[in-house]
Amino acid sequence: KKFELIPVLEEQVRAGKFFMGVCLGMQALFEKDYEGGEYDCLGFLPGDIVPFRTALKVPHMGWNELEFRGSHWLQKGLPAHPYVYFVHSYHKSPADSPDVIATADYGQAVPAICGRDNVLGFQFHPEKSGPVGARLLQNVIAYVQEKG
């Protein structure tokens, strides 16, 4: 808001430009964030960012398996059981909305990949997720190149 970039981002997304967020960047794609208060986000995807309600250690730091909700272009070239690296204390809610592409289990289903149309978010860090993360990023690049 401070740099008046939100209208520019909104215009680019409306124009069909591919837009991706990682970790906090994914969280910014949703409607509200409750980390340290209540904040309006970009609203490109439905849902809110809420704290974990689990007996497990928070922040969630470590490797978890992605569980895709169906066939998706991001799966191309991935192993049968792809693991990715997470570092976060908040997550997208609800976990069962149609924009959730893949989840990970951390005492609850945690949305790990969300997206629709030209908007995509990774809650985990693909750049820290070894060959699986590299493959996911390669798939994103191929998708964007194909779509123009």
Region locations from a protein language model:
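Cysteine-nucleophile active-site neighborhood
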Residues: 1-63
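Amide-donor transfer/coupling interface in amidating biosynthetic enzymes
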Residues: 10-14, 48-148
